[in-house]
């Protein structure tokens, strides 16, 4: 799951 600030 992509969360704000995470570039995965």
From Swiss-Prot:
Q: Does the keyword Transmembrane apply?
A: no
Q: For this UniProt entry, which residues form the secretion signal?
A: none
Show the GO MF annotations: toxin activity
Localization in the cell: Secreted
Name the UniProt key words of this record, in alphabetical order.
Disulfide bond, Secreted, Toxin
Q: How is it modified after translation?
A: Contains 2 disulfide bonds.
Q: In which tissues is it expressed?
A: Expressed by the venom gland.
Listed under GO cellular component are:
extracellular region
**Would the keyword Chaperone turn up in this protein's UniProt record?**
no
Principal location listed in the UniProt entry: secreted
Tell me what else is known.
Answer: The peptide is constituted by 125 AA.
Describe the task this protein carries out: Has a vascular smooth muscle spasmogenic activity.
What is this protein's name?
U28-ctenitoxin-Pn1a
Species name: Phoneutria nigriventer (Brazilian armed spider)
